[in-house]
Amino acid sequence: MSDLGHLMPGMAEIMPLVGGRIWKCYYAGLAKNKALASFQLKEAINLMEKGAILRPKYSEDMDEFIGGIVGKIRGCIDSEDWVGFEAAFVTMIEEANAYHEKYDKGFLRWKMPDQPPPDLDLTAT
């Protein structure tokens, strides 16, 4: 049983998936595609919650992050406040990188890719 923890995905596996969803959420929001932005954020939150369950040492901070700035982004999407959405994204990235620092992973500095994801039509509604 003690070896099962090593078989479960850790944050090093989960967070790149979160980053991909956040990337898609951001560019969907820039395209004012509420449905796609909302879906991508929901999927990112699901992955973050899974990470918090699988790695309980992160659960309190993950809950705070999801309930705080991520919740603000969700509100911006729901109300189609795209200006607030962009501003909240800047804050979210800063906060995410601050958590990396907190957990001695300051070398992990996430940034939004300069280009939208090529695998989705962000304008489709």
Mark where each language-model region is:
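C-terminal-biased regions
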Residues: M1-T125
